């Protein structure tokens, strides 16, 4: 986009939740046109979402590879075009990480960890938005991440507050969910 005739050369990316991993993934390549990213409860890595402090969440073995991966299949002959080697090994990798703490073989999780390459390659800014009551994408995706960015000289700002897995400017949804325990 940044090199198109109609562009001023500056590109930004935004995404929320799992889609919030896309800005991180774009930033890890150090593209000169990517000036800012805005991950809203965005994933710095897929494994880091559900494995931390030596334990995993119950959804860990199947969530991304089983649940999200199944969205590409609807029972028609075009489904074969959606198959790729990573989709096939993904569920096994999730189970092996759940059982043994890491993958048995390959670099499936390393490919899906973006933060280290962002710290090494990205020259733009980051505006982190994170609900501190978010129990879907936990706040550890934003803190200490913001400090790591700043320590590496990446301009980083944050909007953190007491909301769950949602946008901070949706008060009606926030109050509706608070009756459910605010666990997002």
Task: Walk through the language-model features, giving the residues of each.
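Accessory cap/linker subdomain of secreted extracellular hydrolases
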Residues: 25-121
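Short beta-strand immediately N-terminal to the catalytic nucleophile in serine-hydrolase-like folds
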Residues: 13-15, 40, 129
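Gly/Ser-rich "nucleophile elbow"/oxyanion-hole loop immediately N-terminal to the catalytic nucleophile
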Residues: 1-17
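Short beta-strand/loop motif that positions the catalytic acidic residue
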Residues: 122, 128-130, 134
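Alpha/beta-hydrolase-fold serine-hydrolase catalytic core, especially in secreted/extracellular enzymes
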Residues: 150-184
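Core-facing hydrophobic residues within beta-strands of well-ordered domains
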Residues: 8, 33-35, 155
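Glycine-rich nucleophile elbow surrounding the catalytic serine of serine-hydrolase chemistry
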Residues: 15-25, 136
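Conserved alpha/beta-hydrolase "acid-adjacent" motif
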Residues: 135-143
């Amino acid at each position: 986009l940044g090199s198109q005739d109609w562009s001023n050369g500056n590109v930004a990316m935004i995404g929320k939740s799992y889609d919030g991993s896309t800005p991180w993934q774009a930033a890890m390549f150090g593209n000169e046109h990517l000036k800012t990213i805005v991950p809203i409860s965005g994933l710095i890595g897929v494994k880091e979402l559900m494995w931390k402090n030596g334990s995993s969440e119950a959804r860990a073995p199947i969530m991304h590879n089983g649940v999200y991966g199944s969205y590409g299949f609807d029972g028609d002959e075009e489904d074969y075009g959606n198959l790729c080697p990573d989709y096939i090994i993904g569920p096994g990798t999730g189970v092996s990480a759940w059982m043994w703490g890491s993958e048995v073989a390959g670099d499936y999780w390393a490919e899906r960890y973006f933060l280290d390459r962002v710290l090494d390659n990205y020259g733009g800014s980051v505006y982190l938005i994170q609900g501190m009551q978010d129990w879907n994408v936990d706040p550890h995706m934003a803190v200490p991440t913001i400090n790591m960015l700043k320590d590496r000289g990446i301009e980083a700002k944050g909007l953190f507050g007491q909301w769950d897995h949602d946008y901070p400017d949706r008060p009606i949804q926030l109050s509706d969910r608070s009756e459910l325990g605010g666990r997002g």
